[in-house]
């Protein structure tokens, strides 16, 4: 049976859960939120160190890219959350806002209301930073928001050794989430008492007690219903039936950097020639839908270690420690430390993040490891390469074509930056605090020393996504942008996009924090 609501929100992830929650604070306003996946009842969701067990499960969209020529022709696995909380229910819980300059760059492209000075108040509104490390985070952080953020409870000693090795190599310590967090630090995490705390936990579940909010799970949006030049609802499929939920005011797409552009194109909003290839009538010619795809590529170097890695996280003692005290290895977010560095000294800002995981997180975590190990490597946080999302067919259940075009920039800047980052990692591996803890090279395979050939091999065979796609429904002040600075889709009234797809340029950080920010900002823009 079809239904009506003031607002229809598609997706309940990092941004969608926020939008649905905030819009429903007005008891006179009705909101329906559509989630393709189930409730977040999978037992591994709450256990921080277990997130890779959610890969290719029933709560994962389980995407693959097209073969990447610069990465040995491999198809790269892209997990995306298909569950209440979206990817915030299966990510590594790293709360890394990025640099103030990233948001000022957004403002240059989309107006002053997206500057760091403007969005800082939203971060404070979001965050509930535990008192135990508030002195570390400083006045920039929030302490009364709904999203719990804390220090790690039981980081591994080898993580401390990696940080010490970075310092010995001349890199400074940094305060996490400061306006310019250049340097190295232990990761702060979206956890509460040692368990994952997703946007479903922070925003959606408290709001679901409201009578004016309906959250429909197992409801896959198939297109936006458009009457003339106005969005009037969303068609979705549930239990094998096709239904429509009508929106009296607005439809808000929060389906993420893959699914939001796919939905726009399925609804007739996109490049007219591409839509015609799939016999989709053009509602509005928007050539940039699906373009400007940005992602953070990571290359991991793997090493055998004797002990103290998360390979032992499922041992009985660790299970008991977690169940009784919420301590031990199972509280680990895996990516326990990171640092921002420059591939070239003349750069104004870091273009690389180095990440450390005290775990044998090899082969995109799709193959069970054989023993103890650790990984670390560079992440390209300011890529020059741009990719694209396109339709594979007009079937809404067909996975879209994901073409990130990693390392494809004509000047070779991205490749040079990653190689520079790998050389820094090799230096850190050989520094005194760490070198005696590392055994044989586990990745890339069949390597015995960290020479240039090994680093080149790692770039080709050990690179994968850090799970941060963005930019495919670019926000901007220019007429070519997909959405305007108020997140309204150009050419169609009553339709907005609010998720990582609207980011007009990269963030030198992780996309969860700015996606939550976009959700908060979107709710204010809609209500104003």
From Swiss-Prot:
<keyword id="KW-0560">Oxidoreductase</keyword>
<dbReference type="InterPro" id="IPR012132">
    <property type="entry name" value="GMC_OxRdtase"/>
</dbReference>
<dbReference type="Pfam" id="PF00732">
    <property type="entry name" value="GMC_oxred_N"/>
</dbReference>
<keyword id="KW-0285">Flavoprotein</keyword>
<dbReference type="Pfam" id="PF05199">
    <property type="entry name" value="GMC_oxred_C"/>
</dbReference>
<comment type="similarity">
    <text>Belongs to the GMC oxidoreductase family.</text>
</comment>
<feature type="active site" description="Proton acceptor">
    <location>
        <position position="468"/>
    </location>
</feature>
<keyword id="KW-0274">FAD</keyword>
<dbReference type="InterPro" id="IPR000172">
    <property type="entry name" value="GMC_OxRdtase_N"/>
</dbReference>
<dbReference type="GO" id="GO:0009274">
    <property type="term" value="C:peptidoglycan-based cell wall"/>
</dbReference>
<dbReference type="GO" id="GO:0005829">
    <property type="term" value="C:cytosol"/>
</dbReference>
<feature type="binding site">
    <location>
        <begin position="6"/>
        <end position="35"/>
    </location>
    <ligand>
        <name>FAD</name>
    </ligand>
</feature>
<dbReference type="GO" id="GO:0005886">
    <property type="term" value="C:plasma membrane"/>
</dbReference>
<dbReference type="InterPro" id="IPR036188">
    <property type="entry name" value="FAD/NAD-bd_sf"/>
</dbReference>
<protein>
    <recommendedName>
        <fullName>Uncharacterized GMC-type oxidoreductase Rv1279</fullName>
        <ecNumber>1.1.-.-</ecNumber>
    </recommendedName>
</protein>
<dbReference type="InterPro" id="IPR007867">
    <property type="entry name" value="GMC_OxRtase_C"/>
</dbReference>
<dbReference type="GO" id="GO:0016614">
    <property type="term" value="F:oxidoreductase activity, acting on CH-OH group of donors"/>
</dbReference>
<dbReference type="GO" id="GO:0050660">
    <property type="term" value="F:flavin adenine dinucleotide binding"/>
</dbReference>
């Amino acid at each position: 049976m079809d239904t009506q609501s003031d607002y229809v929100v598609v997706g309940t992830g990092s941004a969608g859960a926020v939008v649905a929650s905030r819009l429903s604070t007005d008891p006179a306003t009705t909101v329906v939120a559509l989630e393709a996946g189930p409730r977040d009842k999978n037992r591994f969701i709450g256990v921080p160190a277990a997130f890779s067990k959610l890969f290719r499960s029933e709560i994962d969209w389980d995407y693959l890219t097209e073969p990447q020529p610069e990465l040995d022709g491999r198809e790269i696995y892209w997990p995306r959350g298909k569950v209440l909380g979206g990817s915030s229910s299966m990510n590594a819980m790293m709360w890394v806002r990025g640099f103030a300059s990233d948001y000022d760059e957004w403002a240059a492209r989309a107006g002053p209301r997206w500057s760091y000075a403007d969005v800082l108040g939203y971060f404070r509104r979001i965050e509930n930073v535990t008192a135990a490390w508030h002195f570390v985070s400083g006045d920039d952080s929030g302490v009364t928001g709904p999203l719990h953020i804390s220090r790690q409870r039981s980081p591994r000693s080898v993580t401390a050794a990696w940080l010490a090795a970075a310092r010995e190599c001349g890199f400074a310590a940094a305060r996490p989430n400061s306006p310019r967090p250049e340097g190295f630090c232990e990761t702060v995490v979206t956890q509460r008492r040692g368990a994952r705390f997703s946007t479903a936990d922070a925003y959606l579940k408290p709001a679901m007690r409201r009578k004016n909010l309906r959250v429909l799970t197992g409801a896959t949006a198939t297109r936006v219903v458009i009457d003339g030049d106005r969005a009037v609802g969303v068609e979705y499929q549930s239990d094998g039936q096709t239904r429509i939920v009508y929106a009296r005011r607005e439809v808000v797409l929060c389906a993420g950097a893959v699914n939001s552009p796919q939905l726009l194109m399925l609804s007739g909003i996109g490049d007219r020639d591409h839509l015609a290839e799939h016999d989709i009538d053009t509602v509005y010619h928007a050539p940039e839908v699906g373009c400007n795809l940005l992602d953070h590529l990571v290359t991991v170097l793997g090493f055998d270690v004797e002990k103290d890695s998360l390979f032992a996280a499922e041992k009985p003692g660790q299970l008991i420690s977690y169940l009784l005290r919420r301590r031990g290895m199972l509280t680990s977010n895996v990516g326990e430390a990171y640092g921002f560095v420059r591939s070239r000294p003349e750069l104004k800002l870091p273009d690389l993040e180095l990440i450390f995981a005290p775990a044998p997180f090899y082969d995109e975590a799709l193959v069970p490891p054989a023993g103890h190990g650790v990984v670390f490597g560079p992440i390209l946080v300011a890529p020059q390469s741009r990719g694209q999302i396109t339709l594979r067919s007009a079937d809404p259940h067909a996975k879209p074509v994901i073409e990130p075009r990693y390392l494809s920039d004509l000047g070779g800047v991205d490749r040079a930056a990653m190689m520079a980052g790998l050389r820094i990692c090799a230096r850190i591996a050989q520094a005194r605090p760490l070198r005696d803890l590392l055994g044989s090279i586990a990745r890339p395979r069949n390597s015995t020393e960290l020479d240039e050939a090994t680093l080149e091999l790692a770039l080709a065979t050990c690179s994968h996504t850090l799970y941060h796609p963005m930019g495919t429904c670019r926000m901007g002040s220019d007429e070519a942008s997909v959405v305007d600075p108020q997140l309204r889709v150009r050419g169609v009234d009553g339709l907005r996009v609010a998720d990582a797809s609207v980011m007009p340029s990269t963030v030198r950080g992780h996309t969860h924090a700015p996606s939550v920010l976009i959700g908060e900002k979107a709710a204010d823009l809609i209500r104003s």
